[in-house]
Amino acid sequence: MGQKINPLGFRLGATQSHLSLWFAQPKSYSMGLQEDEKIRECIKNYVQKNPRLSSGFEGIARIEIKKRIDLIQVIIYIGFPNLFIEGRTQGIKELQMSVQKRLNSVNQRLNIAIARISKPYGQPNILAEYIALQLKNRVSFRKAMKKAIELTEQADTKGIQIQIAGRIDGKEIARVEWIREGRVPLQTIRAKIDHCFHKVQTIYGVLGIKIWIFVDEE
């Protein structure tokens, strides 16, 4: 059997960079890691709870965290302009206060910035959320996967692979279905591949969605 490795971890330092940039003493490293998890969780919860921000799905491509002694810099990469645009500064201030409250950190200031991505459907997280929304609305999984592939073609990607696992279409036995378009060279380290895993709760149970996108070769 082939051993599967996470394509992002496999390429760290080569074509993939870290989403968290900070240093810590070995004793306090785990606390820093938990702090990062709290920040990401808080941002996602805030977007989900505000219907004016999320039209069915979050639209967040990734969240980068950079820490200094006195500052935590958070950059949220979004795919769609409706997220945080209406009453922009007000929305960011609310979010900043919400995250600061959750962290309960006195020594470090928190700064949240928003960055827009030009081709949102080239991002696996946004694409996975789109497929999840289709599956929740009981659209056929094959139709949802084909539509997702059509959307990635607009983003000039070189290849995409989509995998859905679980009780697909409410069948009694769980199975795995996948589709690939173009090249997805998982064993080539210099190939820049974006990957994500997303869970979706349907009326039949939980489905797992995995997406691999071949962006470019360095």
From Swiss-Prot:
CDD domains: KH-II_30S_S3
Domain KH type-2: 43-118
Annotated localization: Plastid, Chloroplast
GO terms for biological process, alphabetical: translation
Family (UniProt): Belongs to the universal ribosomal protein uS3 family.
Assigned GO CC terms: chloroplast; cytosolic small ribosomal subunit
Source organism, top-level taxon: Eukaryota
Species this protein is from: Acorus calamus (Sweet flag)
NCBIfam families from the UniProt entry: rpsC_bact
PROSITE patterns, alphabetized: KH_TYPE_2, RIBOSOMAL_S3
Keywords of the record: Chloroplast, Plastid, Ribonucleoprotein, Ribosomal protein, RNA-binding, rRNA-binding
Gene: rps3
Pfam families in the record: Ribosomal_S3_C
InterPro entries: KH_dom-like_a/b, KH_dom_type_2, KH_sf_prok-type, Ribosomal_S3_C_sf, Ribosomal_uS3_bac-typ, Ribosomal_uS3_C, Ribosomal_uS3_CS
A GO molecular-function annotation: rRNA binding
Subunit and interaction comment: Part of the 30S ribosomal subunit.
PANTHER family: 30S/40S RIBOSOMAL PROTEIN S3 (PTHR11760), SMALL RIBOSOMAL SUBUNIT PROTEIN US3C (PTHR11760:SF19)
Protein name (Swiss-Prot/TrEMBL): Small ribosomal subunit protein uS3c
